[in-house]
């Protein structure tokens, strides 16, 4: 019996080895679009994952312990790109980072930065990007989705349970999303990777203060392939173990209830409170138009058995345009006469103007008289001759007397 069991195990191992050797080597596909790849762009340190609240999701449960855990959800990046188009910004900058959250700290998993991106294209279509930086043990069985916003975890181990956080930043606007990963109980994948957080040199867990001081990208993360060749590398390892990656993956669901087995020691996140809808203001009630005449109150006729009878209508009074004069008791001061404004005089010649004209006329006459006097004074007899008299004194003496 023991010999038969050993022979069966040898045959099975030989058959598996033949299948593994038959797996062809991966071929690296070309980039989906042209871009320039560099080691760093603007960020030299990994941004902190503790910058604000996060939306919480939990991944789909695995039916196969060696399946693929999909950390996928829509971060609503299209809204930010449409906003950039509306503000006529020609390009935008972005970066994506993944972390594993523990008690008050975070393990680095993945970081990439984009620049000179076209907001009219899908997210990640940029002219410049950095080389994807990975924590080396995670790159062996994790890789980004095709849109580079999700993360796929192939054949996870029990140590992979817990809380993972994604940070997507577009032009300084941060979008945080938490994913809760829980694996089926009592099932283990035989070829799952082992935990290396404690044995690997750079598997430290960084607090918020450490991120604020600066966690260098090039020192604690390792460059790896871009998304298309990275997927082929992980798929090659998966196929060597007799599996094939599925073409589609189910997205995570919002965190409505606790998972069946939350990670031990991980802080339980709280969903972000949704804003309460503001009550709509009620329209003001319409004010009824005042009636022309108020109804007359009813009176009770005791002689008729107490039944209310309406009062007779009041006689109409003629409209008085003005109130009658007030009656002032004797001995009271009489009201003063109302002020009567003066009637303006008819337009005419001003008295001041008449004085000026008269004075000017007199001065003119005086000036003419002075001029005539001087004229005759200077001319002497000549002037006298002009008036019919002698020219000078000698001629006056020569004239015979009467």
Swiss-Prot record:
By its UniProt entry, which Gene3D superfamilies does this protein fall under?
Answer: 2.70.230.10
Instruction: Please give one Gene Ontology molecular function term for this protein.
Output: receptor ligand activity
Keyword annotations of the record:
Disulfide bond, Glycoprotein, Host-virus interaction, Membrane, Signal, Transmembrane, Transmembrane helix, Viral attachment to host cell, Viral attachment to host entry receptor, Viral envelope protein, Virion, Virus entry into host cell
Task: List S-S links within the chain.
Answer: 66-189, 105-205, 117-126
- Which spans are transmembrane here? 356-376
In which residue ranges is the amino acid composition biased (Pro residues)? 282-292
Q: Which SUPFAM superfamilies match?
A: Immunoglobulin (SSF48726)
Q: How is it modified after translation?
A: Not N-glycosylated.
Extract the ranges annotated as region (Profusion). Answer: 238-316
- Membrane topology value: Single-pass type I membrane protein
Signal sequence: where?
1-17
Q: Which Pfam families match?
A: Herpes_glycop_D
Listed Basic and acidic residues bias regions: 293-304
Per the record, the GO terms for biological process are: entry receptor-mediated virion attachment to host cell; symbiont entry into host cell
Q: Name one GO cellular component term.
A: membrane
- In residue numbers, the region (Disordered) covers 252-350
Q: What is its main location?
A: virion
User: Where is this protein localized, as stated in its record?
Assistant: Virion membrane
Superkingdom is Viruses
Provide ranges: composition bias, Basic residues: 269-278
| Stated role | Envelope glycoprotein that binds to the host cell entry receptor NECTIN1, promoting the virus entry into host cells. In contrast, does not use host TNFRSF14 as receptor. May trigger fusion with host membrane, by recruiting the fusion machinery composed of gB and gH/gL.
Q: Which family does it belong to?
A: Belongs to the herpesviridae glycoprotein D family.
Q: What is this protein called?
A: Envelope glycoprotein D
């Amino acid at each position: 019996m023991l010999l038969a069991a050993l022979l069966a195990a040898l045959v099975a191992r030989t058959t598996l080895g033949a299948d593994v050797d038959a797996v062809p080597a991966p071929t690296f596909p070309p980039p989906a679009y042209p871009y320039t790849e560099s080691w760093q762009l603007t960020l030299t340190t990994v941004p902190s994952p503790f910058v604000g609240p996060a939306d919480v999701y939990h991944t789909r449960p695995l039916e196969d312990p060696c399946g693929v855990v999909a950390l996928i959800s829509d971060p609503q990046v299209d809204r930010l790109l449409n906003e950039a188009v509306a503000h006529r910004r020609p390009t935008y900058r972005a970066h994506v980072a993944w972390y594993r959250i523990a008690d008050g700290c975070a393990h680095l998993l993945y970081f990439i930065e984009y620049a000179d991106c076209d907001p009219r294209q899908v997210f990640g279509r940029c002219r410049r990007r950095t080389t994807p930086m990975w924590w080396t043990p995670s790159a062996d069985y994790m890789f980004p989705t095709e849109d580079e916003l999700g993360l796929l975890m192939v054949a996870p181990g029990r140590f992979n349970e817990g809380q993972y956080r994604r940070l997507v930043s577009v032009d300084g606007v941060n979008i945080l999303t938490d994913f809760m990963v829980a694996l089926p109980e009592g099932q283990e994948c035989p070829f799952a990777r082992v935990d290396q957080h404690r044995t690997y040199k750079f598997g430290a867990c960084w607090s918020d203060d450490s991120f604020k001081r600066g966690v260098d990208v090039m020192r604690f993360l390792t460059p790896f392939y871009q998304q298309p060749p990275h997927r082929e590398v992980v798929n090659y390892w998966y196929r060597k173990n007799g599996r094939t990656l599925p073409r589609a993956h189910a997205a995570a669901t919002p965190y409505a209830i606790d998972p069946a087995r939350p990670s031990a020691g991980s802080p339980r996140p709280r969903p972000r409170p949704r804003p309460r809808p503001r009550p709509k203001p009620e329209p003001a009630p319409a004010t009824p138009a005042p009636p022309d005449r108020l109804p007359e109150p009813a009176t009770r006729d005791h002689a008729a058995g107490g039944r209310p009878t309406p009062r007779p209508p009041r006689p109409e009074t003629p409209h008085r345009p003005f109130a009658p004069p007030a009656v002032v008791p004797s001995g009271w001061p009489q009201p003063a006469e109302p002020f009567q404004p003066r009637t303006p005089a008819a337009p005419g010649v001003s008295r001041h103007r008449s004085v000026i004209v008269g004075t000017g006329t007199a001065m003119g006459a005086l000036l003419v008289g002075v001029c005539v006097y001087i004229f005759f004074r200077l001319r002497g007899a000549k002037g006298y001759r002009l008036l019919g008299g002698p020219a000078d004194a000698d001629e006056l003496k020569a004239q015979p007397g009467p």
